[in-house]
Amino acid sequence: MSDRILFLSNGSICYDSTTYFINCIGEELKAMGWEVMHIRLDKATQKDKLCVLADEYDSQPFDYVFDINTKLDAVCDDSGRYCFDRLGKAVWHYILDHPFYHHDSLNVPLKNMNVICLDRNHKKFIEETYPHINKCIVLPLAAKQAEGGLKPYDMRDNDLIFTASYTDPDMVYFKAKKQDSENVDFFNTFTQRLFDNPELTQEEAIRQMYPGISGVQTAEKLQENFMADVYIQAAIRQEIVVQLIRNHVPVKLYGHNWDTFLMKAEVLMKEDLPFIKEFVKDCGEVMYGELPNIYNNARLSINQLPWFKAGIHDRTPLALMN
């Protein structure tokens, strides 16, 4: 009998990227002879549906449960039992961010929880912080080549693309400043430490600030102050495009909210206004499944790693494949 896997998802995030990844992984498993099921759970009714699955677990035709970036691990029935434990199946939880973003899920003491992550440092942090997790492996996300094959390099329309959402770091900073004084002090110290020492991981910076802190306390500290991490990523993303403009490198921007950046740049970078209007193009949001064709029509792409120090971001194989 072939292996059988159930994919669970609850909602569409990041340009429907998680659904795209699940579909791609499912296609590969089917090609290997696996039986694949995919259930999409509405967040309002996910508890009820998981409980139904748990009630009928003996008759459920699957061996593994797989999800990407969900918080389903923590869903309990009315008696307080975790639905995933009641299923009696091995659970594989694929996380695409730093583990602290998933602390509430990873901290759930499921009987057979397994984790896939993208970075070797993330794996080490998970193994040290959540000893109840049965297994943790590092497996980067692969990529698809554009349909129809590779477009000849000299026939591509775009010289440079950048695919990412824009978040105004100034707005994140102002929001962070409205917190209590302790969190503001943490925000300032933590962000500056990482900017000054970009080789550090988030957890290494925390351990320097709080010697002797435990893994769980580190995750809780980072989770409580997640805006500090958001600010760092937003500031780097903005600086990438600012430097492209200052050096007059044409670029096409794909993603949410770049129109906000361009309005800001037109005010603060008036000396570059003619260049911005002609050579910096906001192409708007696109679904993740459109990216292979977009990359296949560009000669170069820029990728911003989300502070991974020992891992690969999905946009890198996407560029390499196209």
Regions found by a protein language model. Give the residues of each.
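Alpha-helix boundary/capping detector
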Residues: L110, C117, K270, P317-M321
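Nucleotide-sugar donor-binding catalytic core of glycosyltransferases
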Residues: S2, S9-F21, T129-H313, M321
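Residue-level detector of short, conserved catalytic/binding motifs and their immediate flanks
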Residues: K89, M113, N158, V249, ...
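Extended catalytic core of nucleotide-activated donor transferases of GT-like folds
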Residues: R4-S12, T18-T129, K144-G149, C283, ...
